[in-house]
Structure formats: C-alpha cells, structure tokens
C-alpha cells in the first residue's frame, strides 16, 4: 500500500486511479492528485484517500521540488521556406557572393550544344553537369557531318556523341546507374552499356594475379596504369534520339582521344595529340613503372615488351594482297593467301581491280600467263559465292583484252566452259552469249579461212551446252551471225545447211528474230532467188488454209533495203498476193509496209494500183 501511495513522481495527476487491494484492504481506493504551490512543508504534498465506506483520510508524502512549468511556452510562429525544406543544409548558400561565384563557375564550363538539337540532349547534358559532376563535356553532331560526307560509315553510328570525364571507375559506374534511372523515368527506355566491369570479376582478377609467384608479395593495386579503377570507359547507347554517351576516366580519355575521331574536319587539329604531350605522358608512365620494386619482374618484362618495336601489321590482309599484286609479287601473295584462307573468296575480284588499276594508271603490260596461273591455282575448291563465275569470266576476258596474243579467245573454252561444267555447275545462256559476242566483236574474222577457224571454236563450245539453252531465239540469231563476216563479204557454205536444219527443226515456224537475221543476211549477200524460194516454198503455207507467216518481218526486211529491183521482183512474182489468198489480217502497220513497198517501185501509183487496192482494205487505211 505504501509503494502504491508514493506518488511523488506524479504531482499533477488529473485522472482517477482505481486499485484493488488483495490482502488487507478489501475496498476500492479513488485517488485524485491536487496541484499545490511549491512550498517546503512536510504536509505540502498529500492525497485524499476515500474508501468505499466514505471515510476520508489524509496521507502525507515526502516534500519535493517541482523542476518544470505547467505553462505552455510562448514562441513566435516560424515561417518555413518550402524551397529550403528540400535543399540539404550543406548545399544552402548563405551569402549572395557565394551564389554569384557558383554561377560564374558554371558559366566557365558551359557546354556548347548543336543547333536544332532535341530537348533530350539538353536534359541529358544538364543532368551530367549538374547532378553527376562530370566535367569536360563535349557534344559532337554527327548528323550534320553525314550530310557533307554520306559515305563515311563512322558517322552512321548515331546522330549525337557526348564525351565527358569522370574522376574514377566508381564515378563512371555510379553515373551510368543514375543516367539509366533518368532514361527510365523520363523516356521509358533502358540504356545499353559496354565497358562495364563487375567489381566481383575485378576482385577475382586481382586474386588470380596475386597467386603468381612473382607477384605474390606485390600490391597489385599500386599499378594504376594497368588497373581498371583508373582507366575505364563506359559507352552507353541511350536509345533516345540516337544519342551515344562516352564516360571515361582522365587517363583513358587521353589514351583513346575520341575527340579526334568524332570532330569535324575543320576542328580535328584542335584535338590532335602533340609530340610534346605524348613524350610527357610516356615519361610519366616510365617513371611509374620504375617506382615499383625490383621483385616485380613480370611488370618490368611487360614494360620492355610494350616499348619494343611492333612485330605485326595493322593493315588489312586484303589491302596487303592488293599491294603485293600491284608489284606482281606472286610468291608473297601466295604466302598471304596461305596465312589468310578467307581471302581466296575475294581473290578474283581483287585481281580484276588490280589489273584495271595497272592498265589505267601506268598503262604497263602484264604477264597474263603468271596472272592466270596464280588466280586459277588459288581459288577455293568449294565455291559458295554465287557471283564467282561471273567474276571469273570477267577476269579471263580482261586477260584477253590486255594481251590477246598470249591469252587467246580459244582458251575461254577449256579455262572457263570446261572448268565450270567439270565442277558441277550448269552452263547458262549468258555464258554462250558472251562467248559468241567475243567471236563477233573481238575476233572479227576478215576472210573465209579466219571465219572457218572461228566457227570451229563456236562448234566446240556449243557441244558443251544443252539443247534447251541453244535453241532459243536470241542464241540462234547470234549463231547465224558467226557464219558470216561483219563486212558481209564472206559466209560459210554451212549457212544454207543451218537454214535447212532450222526449217526442219521448227516445221516452217522459225522464231521471229532468227528468221529476221536469216532474211537480212540473204538480202545483204544478194541471194534474192534463195530468199524467194525460202519464203514461198520452205516456210510457205498450205493452200486453202490461213497464212500465218510473219509478213511484217518479211516486208520490213525488204523495205529497209530500198532496193527497187528486189521489191519489183517480189511484186511481179506474185508473192504479195498470198496475203489475199491466205486471208491475212492487214492491220495499219502491215498496210504502211505495203504502201511503202508499192511507192518504192511506183511513186505515181500507176502500175500497181489495182493490186494495191486488193491488198490494202479501206478499213486499214482509215485506221
């Protein structure tokens, strides 16, 4: 009960406390504290105890001094600045002079942005400068540079490139995380990064190096020149407005010198490394290596290796091959092909461009035999390029064009046609067309015996082709042209045999172009009688049936000659009357050809007037 009534710790109780006594007092106590002035009297602090029976007693408490006030403190209302609540205390500027100083510093590091650049570039650069504290920010506009140099593939990577410097690898990593947050919040995309090194992987790398005998007692992290902590490069594809961001440490930025790569042509000189700066940088690196202990012999060996002369080439193998072929160093070229088997697929195209370069620039003659042996012996056995045979034929024709004496057109048959067929490839119509064009244009026989020799090669080539390829209108017309000279002075006796064979083969329905070639050839050689026999009997029509012969082709070949005797012979022999007998449809084109033929032999229209009215209906004239 005494412990219950010790209320000196509660002098201002305004509530009632009900306590149930379990042993001596079997009644409920109601206690209310009364606040008294602070007076040092033993009975100052007391409580009225009222039992259930109604008896009131006064219980004294030990005196105590009140060390607090029951009055509410009177304070002035505090006016809170909404802007200051969100600004940390260490970033608040108490003086206007400091604020102006900060503005001056920001103006000194103002970033120059391209004209008409997107808003995302402004936001990103501002975030890099203000929030991430990245310095030396440069922005290059590759979009406008592409307009001046559209063939430069370096400028097709993106539209804008940002280059900035971070203080350490940790700074690079943290900057990438913050930039990725900005991209996700503002544009809903995630950037793609290259160059990010996992810290766990870096620790494993260092432990692996530490296990080496020579480096076991060495603090590897002292070598800042070879540590990723001091030489890092984060390249980020922002996926927004084709912007690429490069975050580099200072050493890495100096080493890569990306500014010279992306700068316009008129500004490249501003970012070129001077010999003095390169010399200073090399000396600093050498001093850093020398500062290591003598037991770091592996690093010293690496230093010697880095300083020794480069024993490899940075030139592409294809360019090296071209340079050797220009000098006709076939032994060195063969060694290059052995070291780089992938060049065999490009060998023919490289050889063509090299020969054309030699011929056009210097005009020097080439050794066609050595060129042929080198290319033919080094082409791949398994050919996957679909354009290989076209390039190979062009290469052989180029050799023939450079020197037709050492590389004759006759070699096209074994070197190309036979080789292609023996490797399982089908000979196409383009192959025989090209060969026949070579015979007609390049060989160009001038006498009968030259024509016989050329025709022998034609027959040998035709034997390699299938009938489906040969018996086409375009091929047959070219074959017939090879039976005569271009001057129309000589023709082979087999010319007439070929005509008989074609009449038998096509059953009087010879293809149009082939028939036109035959008719023109007969007219050029003055074979008028054979021409009439061919037209009236060999490819004639059956009496009583419809005439389906190509009259337009026949009359066109005749009227183009302007030969009065030939046209008069055809009219007087009654050949044109077959148009009426065979019920040929006379359209306006055929009517014009008939009028031209009659006008050539009868300008005044007096002799063949009746025949003209019979053959040309009035309906065709009105049309």
UniProtKB/Swiss-Prot annotation:
Output the Gene Ontology cellular-component terms.
mitochondrial inner membrane
Its localization reads: Mitochondrion inner membrane
Principal localization reads mitochondrion
Say which domain of life the source belongs to: Eukaryota
Q: How does it sit in the membrane?
A: Peripheral membrane protein
Per the record, the GO terms for biological process are: mitochondrial gene expression; mRNA stabilization
Give the keywords, sorted: Membrane, Mitochondrion, Mitochondrion inner membrane, Transit peptide
Taken from the record, one Pfam family name reads: mRNA_stabil
Q: Where is the transit peptide?
A: 1-68
Q: What does it do?
A: Probable mitochondrial mRNA stabilization factor.
* Similarity remark: Belongs to the ATP25 family.
| Name of the protein this chain belongs to | ATPase synthesis protein 25, mitochondrial
Q: Which organism is it from?
A: Candida glabrata (strain ATCC 2001 / BCRC 20586 / JCM 3761 / NBRC 0622 / NRRL Y-65 / CBS 138)
What gene name is given for the protein in this entry? ATP25
């Amino acid at each position: 009960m005494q412990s219950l009534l010790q209320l000196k710790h509660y002098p201002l109780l305004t509530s009632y406390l009900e306590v149930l006594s379990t042993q001596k007092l079997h009644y409920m106590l109601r206690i209310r504290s009364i606040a008294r002035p602070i007076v040092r009297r033993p009975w100052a602090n007391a409580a009225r105890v009222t039992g259930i029976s109604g008896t009131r007693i006064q219980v004294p408490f030990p005196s105590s001094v009140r060390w607090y006030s029951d009055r509410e403190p009177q304070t002035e209302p505090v006016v809170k600045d909404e802007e200051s609540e969100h600004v940390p205390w260490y970033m608040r500027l108490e003086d206007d002079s400091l604020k102006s100083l900060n503005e001056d510093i920001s103006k000194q590091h103002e970033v120059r942005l391209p004209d008409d650049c997107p808003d995302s570039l402004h936001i990103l650069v501002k975030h890099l400068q203000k929030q991430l504290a990245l310095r030396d920010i440069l922005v290059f506009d590759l979009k406008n540079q592409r307009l001046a140099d559209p063939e430069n593939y370096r400028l097709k990577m993106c539209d804008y490139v940002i280059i900035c410097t971070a203080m350490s690898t940790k700074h690079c990593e943290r900057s990438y995380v913050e930039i990725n947050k900005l991209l996700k919040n503002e544009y809903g995309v995630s950037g793609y990064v290259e160059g990010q090194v996992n810290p766990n992987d870096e620790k494993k790398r260092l432990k692996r190096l530490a296990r080496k005998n020579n480096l076991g007692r060495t603090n590897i992290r002292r070598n800042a020149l070879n540590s990723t902590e001091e030489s890092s490069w984060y390249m980020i594809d922002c996926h927004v407005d084709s912007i690429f961001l490069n975050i580099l440490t200072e050493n890495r930025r100096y080493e890569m010198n990306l500014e010279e790569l992306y700068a316009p042509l008129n500004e490249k000189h501003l970012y070129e490394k001077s010999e003095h700066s390169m010399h200073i940088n090399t000396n600093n690196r050498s001093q850093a290596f020398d500062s290591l202990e003598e037991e770091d012999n592996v690093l010293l060996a690496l230093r010697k290796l880095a300083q020794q002369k480069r024993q490899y080439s940075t030139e592409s193998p294809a360019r090296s091959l071209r340079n050797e072929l220009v000098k006709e160093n076939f032994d060195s070229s063969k060694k290059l092909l052995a070291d780089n088997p992938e060049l065999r697929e490009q060998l023919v195209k490289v050889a063509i461009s090299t020969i054309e370069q030699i011929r056009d620039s210097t005009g020097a003659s080439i050794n066609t035999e050595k060129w042929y042996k080198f290319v033919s012996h080094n082409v791949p056995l398994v050919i996957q390029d679909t354009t290989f045979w076209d390039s190979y034929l062009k290469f052989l024709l180029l050799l023939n064009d450079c020197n037709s004496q050492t590389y004759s057109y006759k070699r096209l048959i074994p070197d190309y046609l036979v080789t292609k067929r023996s490797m399982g490839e089908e000979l196409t119509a383009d192959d025989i067309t090209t060969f026949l064009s070579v015979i007609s244009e390049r060989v160009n026989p001038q006498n009968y015996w030259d024509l016989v020799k050329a025709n022998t090669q034609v027959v040998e080539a035709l034997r390699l082709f299938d009938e489906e390829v040969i018996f086409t209108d375009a091929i047959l017309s070219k074959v017939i042209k090879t039976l005569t000279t271009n001057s129309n002075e000589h023709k082979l006796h087999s010319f007439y045999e070929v005509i008989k064979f074609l009449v038998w083969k096509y059953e009087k329905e010879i293809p149009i172009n082939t028939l036109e070639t035959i008719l023109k050839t007969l007219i050029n050689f003055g074979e008028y009688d054979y021409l009439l026999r061919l037209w009236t009997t060999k490819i004639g029509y059956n009496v009583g049936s419809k005439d389906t012969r190509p009259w337009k082709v026949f009359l066109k070949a005749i009227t183009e000659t302007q030969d009065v005797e030939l046209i008069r012979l055809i009219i007087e022999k009654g050949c044109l009357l077959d148009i009426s007998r065979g019920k040929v449809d006379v359209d306006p084109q055929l009517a014009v050809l008939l009028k031209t033929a009659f006008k050539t032999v009868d300008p005044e229209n007096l002799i063949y007037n009746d025949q003209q009215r019979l053959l040309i209906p009035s309906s065709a004239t009105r049309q």
